[in-house]
Amino acid sequence: KNLCNTRWNVDAETEDPVFSAISDDEKQAIRQQLVPVLVSLASASTPSQAILSQMNESVALVASSDFPEAWPALIDELVSQLSTDNHHVLLSVLATSHAIFKQWRSQFRSDALYSEINLVLGKMANPLLELLQRMHGMLLDPSTPSMTMQPLALCLMLLLQLFYDLSAQDLPPQFEDAIPMLSPMFTSLLSFSRPELIGDEEDVAPSPLVKIRSSVCEIFELYAKRYLDVLPQLPEYVQAVWDMLSTYGPSEKYDVIVSKAIGFLSAVVRMGNQRELFQSDSTLEQFCTAIILPNIQLRDIDEEIFEDNPMEYIRRDLEQSIEIDTRRRAACEFVRALLEQFSTQITTICSRHIQMYLAEYQASPAQNWKRKDAA
């Protein structure tokens, strides 16, 4: 991996006289073996995740330089493994594919980029959709053995991330045609649950199910912002996300999913053309009491973070440019989105709660100082 990182492309003017660039013949030999070695390692009876992660990154590093011109066979090699029943191999191939394609999310549009994406879509889009449907069916099947639920969930999470990668620049025709099939699949993942995927209540790390739902919310937000004209199912997405949000408490392990879900709702509110979904006073009141107030208030864990590292806490709380999913930031952005579309209504509702919180603080400052902070 380090060799691919430091010696794959070396400028002749800065080339190290001791460690020179890899020759073209050596590169060709390495390219021919990277994916087969990855598959071989993943097929072992007890595959080493540490080694597999290095191999995943090695393939991605070489692909960033050589795909597709010098390595046109890469996609065929990866796609050929999507039909395997070995979950370890599937996980490695999907993780490698995501490592290669995730860079598309932030790249500027260009003819070369679109040619690369179209090449991948032509070979991978339909197998990806078939695998997504298969993994979804197995995950929701009550007869699926418990021991396979974790790898299935990880595969599905990576498939959702790949779906986002391939949609980030433009809407693939294959995905557009599949939206009627995909929409009920995606919304079902926001209500589906299995004990094996929930995780330990004491664990602060997001569970596999939370990661899956976070990926679904990211896809919903992307498609709502970019491809609304082919998305008549948007009201169903909003209802599914709203119903899911009500099931999550204040635990730190749910911070990412709550932030992603609120981010999606903020994006839909800002559109303006979806006003009828939110404009009733009762809906806006529910937004305030069920989303804004609970997530804008300080929790015990927030106090602990502040006590351990106050500067870092303030930076996370105030700095808008850093990409950190915090509940308070998501709730504040949701208020701003509502103000853009329902200024009078939301000001009246929020002002009432602000006055109530300040009155509670005045009645008992030592006990209710968090109310003042929230106000």
At which residue positions do the language-model features occur?
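Alpha-helical repeat/alpha-solenoid scaffolds of the HEAT/ARM/MIF4G superfamily
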Residues: 8-142, 146, 169, 251-374
